[in-house]
Amino acid sequence: MRQHIGRHILGAVLAILILASLCGCGMGTGAGADPTPAATTPEPTPTLSPEEEAAQQERQARLAAQKDGYLLDKGYLYAVDETGELRSNTYVGVLYFREDGRYTSGSEDLDRMVAGAIRKSTDEKMTRMDMLRAMYEYTRDHIKYVGFGNHEDSYKAAHGKDGWMVESATYALENGTGNCYHFAATFAALARGVGFQAYAASGLIGSEDQEHGWVEIVDDSGEVWYSDPETEYARSYWMNQKYDLFYKSKDEIGSVTGIGYLELTDPFEAERKEAEAEGRPLPSPAPKT
């Protein structure tokens, strides 16, 4: 009986050894062993959707083609230097571009609303001046005049003080109402959003020195251009007079409206004070004649 069991055990062991030698997976590292580990299937690399990939390629192509200028992406403004690289952590005139290259007013809420207005009102076929005109008309048509509006903002603006543009533009875009200072602040914010050196100015107009707010834009040559969306709105709405007060010289806007414009403060100096108070880098002055 024992001999019978022993023969069965011996046969089983021999069978295992034979199978091991045939399949090359012998015990130990003999000639039949394969020291190379079995290949593993790599994890699939996440892929963009066709729409995301197309959008990414389009942005890259636009960046490569754009030199020393501005680029809009989903309503947000970026600046590109002469080599095609994004400007970041720097000012271009009064426009500040943060670490990721995106322009910011210093307020995420205002940036979001400005980008939304740009997306609604512009397209890539427009020239920058077309976009500026669209922002002017957006301001004129989307704010309803309600007298003094936000009194604190109005007081600061009317008395030639600084620090009111962001606050007043945010109020007007959120509520759709405001006075001349809110119109001015909103257009200045939107104009900056499409890459213009725009300032919300406050001062006195007319022979009676009436307090008023308007916008001044400094072009690349240093010339100053005036825009007054609130006066255009008011004369159209209440007096049925059709004026075009977009991007005029000081003489032109005075001859059209019959009023003169006198600044109480230099808008650029107000910008410097605001940046200094908040601990931000000081903007470099845009040339101004």
What are these regions (language model features)?
Residues H4-T29:
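Sec-dependent N-terminal signal peptides of Gram-positive bacterial secreted proteins and lipoproteins
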Residues L22, G26-R112, D130, G203-L204, ...:
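Extracellular adhesion/carbohydrate-binding repeat motifs centered on closely spaced tryptophans
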Residues G75-Y76, G93, S221-T289:
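His-Asp-centered catalytic microenvironments across diverse enzyme cores
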Residues E108-A172, T265-E269, A275-G279, A286:
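Secondary-structure boundary elements
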Residues M131, M135, G176-A191:
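Active-site nucleophilic cysteine motif
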Residues N150, A158-L173, T177, A184, ...:
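Catalytic cysteine-centered active-site loop
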Residues H182-K248:
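Hydrophobic/aromatic-rich core segments of domains that either
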